Each structure stands twice: as C-alpha cells, then as structure tokens.
Amino acid sequence: MSLDTSSSAIHLQLPPTSSSLRPPSQITVHPSVIAQILTHHSRHSADSESTRVIGALMGNRSDNGQEVDIRSCFAVPHTEQGQQISVDRPFQQDMVNFLAKNGTKEVIVGWYASQKTVNSNSAIIQEYFSFETNPYPAVHLTVDTDIEESGKGLGVKGWVSQPLGLTSKSECSVFVPVPVSIKYADSERAALDLLTAPQPTPSPALPPLPTLSNSLSQLSSLIDQCLAYVQSVNNGSQTPDVEIGRYLLEGLGRWSASGNEDEGGVKAGLQDTLTVEYLSSLVRSQVELAGRLSLLQQPVAQQ
C-alpha cells in the first residue's frame, strides 16, 4: 500500500560507486510509526517557536541496503529559531540505550518531521542524523498533518539527501524522493480497517426492559419459523434440507434438560449469587471492624 501523494517526481536508480553508500530505493513503514508521529504532533505546544516536531526512526535495512524497514520511532526534543537549530542529543542517546537494554534490535535509520515538505533547516538536521546512520545514508519522512480528505494517500513522503557540487556542506545538498509503502501483517488488518472506517452514528440507548422484550419477541419469531419448517417437512409439503436439520439437531442437543431441571438450575444459580453477596458483605464488615479496632489500640499504646 503506497503512502505517497500524487507526484511527478522521477525516481532514478544511479549506478553506485560503493554498495554500502548506495541510497535506498524503497521505504516500508509500519502503521504504528505513523500513529506515533501524529500523536507526537498533536501534543506539540502551540506557543512553541518550532512549527514542527522531529524524531528518530528505528528499523532495519536489507542486506544490500536498498530497502529500509521502519518499525518504530521516538520523539527528539529540538528548537528552531530562524537558522539556529538545537537538538537534544543526550536525550536521544538515552532513548537508544534504553531501547537496546529492552532487547530492541532496531537501529536509527533516519528521522521524521511533521511538515508537508523539506525546507532549508531540513538539510542541517539531515546531516546530524547522517552521522548516526553512517556509513548508510539517513532517510527522512515528512508527514503532512494538514492534508485534506482527498483520498490520495496519507501525506507521507520519503527522502534521502544527495551532495550537490564539490563541497561537503549541508547547504550544498538536494533531497531526492524515495517511494514509501505501508507494511503490516494479516493479523493487523482488522485493527487498520477499524481505524480507517467512518465513525458510526451512535444509536440512542434503549431501556433494559424494552430491549429484553424485543429480544424475546425476535427469539419467539425464530422458534415459530423453525417449528413451521419442521411441521412442513413432517407433512411432506416441503423437501427436507440436510444442513438445516443438522443445525437444528446441534441447537436442540444443547438443551437436553427438562423443565424441572431448568427451573432447579435457575434457583441454584440464584442461591449461589446470594451466597456470594452475603459473604462479600461479611468480609467487608470484618475489614471495617478491624480498622476501627486498630484505631482504638493506637491511643492505648501511646499511653
């Protein structure tokens, strides 16, 4: 499932000079990563000078480095004041060490930002994360949090930076788009469908007794239909169906008790419920009594 919005960019596969330095040609993202980025942006303070939030992307690379699989991420505090950028590196290192102690095998593969596209400061942050992913190039994800419901993707784009010219300065680089796709297991499809489904209209709550009455009426109607079917089969007016007969046999086989036994079971269940309620109230009384006795013993012990 592709996450890129419609774009006229051409993805070129240039011949690399070294296989370890070759930029990736495909980025796969787990759905939880996008959810974490959106959650991070929703908690962003409106009074902050930074209009976006950034964080580190954790994942793995393929053997040839052509595919980057992003499995998790975490927020990295930073500040932007014009061309001045400050990233909390100690916090980032503490998070990496903490995740490593908990058995996480993912490594930093790049960073994300909650903005529509890249800007001049993105090159500086890209250079910072390139030192973390060395010798591999760092990938960059931009998430458009203000995208409208146009049905053209989720506004997630992938980028890698390439040097431009002979100088090695961060300003002399260009961001090249990389295709991004979402990757999930079959067991996670149900949760994704539930999250992306339209919000259902809430139905007014019905009182308990009318709801029970409607349920019993529907059950009685179904029983009448089954009875009419059985009578028509016995009379020979309708051809019997083996599947329906099997379902009726399985349903009736669960209720082998007679009317007296059913009534006795209901009474026994009611008696058990009353017994449990009585014992719970008795225990509650004992606990309250023990607490009051302990309060009375404290002044005597002090004297």
UniProtKB/Swiss-Prot annotation:
* Gene Ontology terms, MF aspect: metallopeptidase activity; translation initiation factor activity; translation initiation factor binding
Keyword annotations for this protein, in alphabetical order, are: Cytoplasm, Initiation factor, Protein biosynthesis
Q: In the UniProt record, does the keyword Heme occur? A: no
On the tree of life, the source organism's domain of life is Eukaryota
Q: Which CDD domains match?
A: MPN_eIF3f
Query: Record's SMART domains?
Result: JAB_MPN
Quote the subunit structure annotation: Component of the eukaryotic translation initiation factor 3 (eIF-3) complex.
UniProt name for this protein:
Eukaryotic translation initiation factor 3 subunit F
Q: Which organism is it from?
A: Cryptococcus neoformans var. neoformans serotype D (strain JEC21 / ATCC MYA-565) (Filobasidiella neoformans)
